[in-house]
């Protein structure tokens, strides 16, 4: 989407909110309990993406986490927030957190949202950069987070 693009620093951060019907390709995982989340073959979700400078990227991560919590609070869905350990965050991420909603029918919390703080991992491959007001060009930082996974949270 922004491969080989250079943003002006004053344009940052750039944020997107997208809605999509997603499909899982993993055969045989539908309905299975996989590390605290129930896999669904098809699901609808809203996803947040952010392109920012190194100085503001952690604030973007906190903003996305805050949006997730706000939505759960507005819907009055009991939840807990977890900071993921290094083993669970995946290769591109420097930091990650999950929101788990309380599912009374299962008498347990289940993952419904995730937020990933990726620093410049994605922009290195994409060569997505920012031109500072000083003229220096450097890699941007990226964040992504589930705004709302309709089937999971409801």
Residues covered by each model-derived region:
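TRNA-recognition modules of translation machinery and tRNA-sensing kinases, especially anticodon-binding
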Residues: 1-154
